Amino acid sequence: MSGKTLYDKIWDAHVVSEAGGEAILYIDLHLIHEVTTPQAFAGLRAAGRKVRRPDRTLAVADHNIPTEGQALGVDAVADEEARLQLKTLARNVADNGIEFFPMGDIRNGIVHVVGPEQGRTQPGMTIVCGDSHTSTHGAFGALAHGIGTSEVEHVLATQTLRQKKAKNMLVRVDGQLPPGVTGKDVALAVIGEIGTAGGTGYVIEFAGEAIAGLSMEGRMTLCNLTIEGGAKAGLVAPDDKTFAYIQGKPAAPKGAAWDMALSHWKTFFTDEDAVFDRTVVIDGSALVPMVTWGTSPEDVIPVTGNVPDPESFATPDKRAAAHRALDYMGLKAGQPISEARIDRVFIGSCTNSRIEDMRAAAAVVQEAFLHGRLVAPHVKAMVVPGSGLVKEQAEEEGLDAIFKAAGFDWREPGCSMCLAMNPDKLAPQERCASTSNRNFEGRQGRAGRTHLVSPAMAAAAAIAGHLVDVRTLFSETAQ
């Protein structure tokens, strides 16, 4: 009998019962927000049920909140539906004794930033949330994935979820990443390799020298984008970096409980003789900064590359999709992607809004400032920290001053321009270099054009006024 993968071990540890090819899984942590919970709580009330484990539930306000004027409170939120959702969440969590970080609380922020920084995300856990990018928490060796509104109600009522086990995929990224290449670039390269449907039916475990070299923030970015490759979830086995990140966090175990937890967490790894259903190997040492050109995360090329010719795609459907994407994006086949002039820059989202992301972007901006460069005159650039605590730390380090001096708008935490559900939106045909996770048509605003990049690449684009290789920005500046 072969050994078990990390996914196998977490799954087996949480099976309550199995029948008909499905299992009832126990859920360790349920993260909730204002958008996907109103109907779920209404269903509980209609059935006369209460939340089964409020202590294993954490609520934040993130999707709909404005990133300016949060001190004015929920009543000042302009959008009526958003205001109602925020008030409804506050009432529902109060009625059920659920811990809640409301808008304006320094602990509030994007749910997938808040969970880890509070120490609620831990190795070996099962974690769900009514949000696609719950896969972020897989960076800690937790089985984490998004669920629908009806499933949100089921978890609230039972602390369990009916699931069919996925297959195992290993993505091994060998070698050391070159300077300028980040977890975001690895994630985009993986999606470019397997496609947006390549992970369908799988849970992906990321391993290899390049993955071991990533910080926890980099691993969170990588796992965050797993869903864009079609996978159920993404995982990185916990190691000393993981344990160091968790230690001392508000909800982390303390004293003897820490020692016990650490011993338990160290059991979550893939056995040497475990067999994966599929293995993908990528040479991390050959990667360069990546950028999307189309309207799907798989439409990705090196920043040094040219926009592909739609006729080069293998199938009629792919060719038609590429033609449509180029028309929507206002690009031409064969043009260097670095010639794409941008109008907006967004640094934020659950993909790239942590303190490391702020530092990486600020380092580029500060270097540009020393070369006499500011945000290009035609570009509107904004930085949105992922939580109040990230914002506070960035300000303690002076990062906000660096951004503001160069012409960036420094905002309050929230999902912001990742999705057009709050005041931060693109105007039609505006082109944005964005650190978010989806470049679908209209994702950042009706007819808006999105290019996914890393924080350093986004900062470089803001300075240059067009997509640019951050590694050569300063040679361009010197010309």
Curated annotation (Swiss-Prot):
Belongs to the aconitase/IPM isomerase family. LeuC type 1 subfamily. The gene is leuC. GO terms for biological process: L-leucine biosynthetic process. [4Fe-4S] cluster binds at C350, C415, C418. Its EC number is 4.2.1.33. Pathway: Amino-acid biosynthesis; L-leucine biosynthesis; L-leucine from 3-methyl-2-oxobutanoate: step 2/4. It catalyses: (2R,3S)-3-isopropylmalate = (2S)-2-isopropylmalate. This is 3-isopropylmalate dehydratase large subunit. Keywords: 4Fe-4S, Amino-acid biosynthesis, Branched-chain amino acid biosynthesis, Iron, Iron-sulfur, Leucine biosynthesis, Lyase, Metal-binding. NCBIfam families: leuC (TIGR00170), PRK05478.1 (NF004016), PRK12466.1 (NF009116).
